[in-house]
């Protein structure tokens, strides 16, 4: 089998909160850390470099903020463990009923065919967890712990 088109990871979900609240949940690490990473070095600001950490796994990602359009779009490049950066775009579509449809797309995966497919599938699963955690937290104030619980033995302590 030959890959003729590099895969793109995409996840999307309706969040039953106004767009400003949903958008801010990704800009402010004090909020994002309730449903995704455990620590962020600062708010997302265009041209800034930010570090996100998943302390339970001992991993982090360096994030370069490329574009922010308030309540509409976030564009970053990121890499973990010194890997080649990929591009992640969040799109926020407000709806008439004061809900928000969020779409996250990651592109730019590199490696051989098997590796690119593995990375894209993993990313899509991760962003699906992310949106599920966001939904539970913003709509019901419940922290599902999805990042930690999807791989409870990944820290090597159990």
Question: Language-model features: where?
Answer:
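Residues at helix-coil transition
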Residues: 27-28, 70, 132, 139-140
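Intrinsic-disorder/low-complexity, polar/charged segments enriched in Ser/Thr/Lys/Arg/Asp/Glu/Gln
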Residues: 6-12, 49, 60, 73, ...
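Beta-strand/loop substructures that line and gate deep hydrophobic ligand-binding cavities in soluble
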Residues: 81-129, 145-147
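Hydrophobic pocket/interface hotspot
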Residues: 22-26, 32, 50, 65, ...
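Short, highly charged C-terminal tails/helix-capping segments
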Residues: 136-158
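Glycine-rich portal/gate segments that line the openings of hydrophobic small-molecule binding cavities
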Residues: 34, 39-80
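Hydrophobic ligand-binding cavity/cleft-lining segments
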Residues: 1-41, 158
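Hydrophobic/aromatic beta-strand elements that line small-molecule binding cavities or substrate pockets
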Residues: 13, 62-67, 87-94
